[in-house]
Amino acid sequence: MHKSGGSLTQSSLLLTGPDVHAGYVRQIINLTQTTSGSYLLMSSLDISRRNLAQRGRQIFHQVADMAEYAREEINAIGGYYAFGKELVNGNSVFDFDITKLSVHTLDIGLAGIEVYDILRDEYDIQIEFGDIGNILAYLSIGDRAQEVERLVSALAEIR
């Protein structure tokens, strides 16, 4: 919930289906969960749940539109590859979370972790992670077009 739904970090919901043994889940929760839950975290979950119940479709359409815009702009810079739905082939890739903006960076001569560090240290932009050849930025309901523009501009300058 905190990544995509707008609740505070460290908050989460556990959703179970009919095939999950409720007693076993309760046993594991009792081993790992505190008896003094944070009312701040629980309140943030409730507010986020309410917001998504009332406006979730609209909100996620806006996030998806921002992500697609970012993907197009990053690919237009040159040297980066922000991949998307074109990877879905029905054999090995069946779907794609468009809110996760994964960008290949090696063609600009920098490893993903280097771009990650530059974004953080020089542009004050914190993304999810960088590895040997990619960075991952996760767009959520808390992001605005302004943040997307900052990311795209920073990547253009880094190139």
Where are these regions (language model features)?
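Short beta-alpha connecting loops at secondary-structure transitions
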Residues: 26-32, 55-56
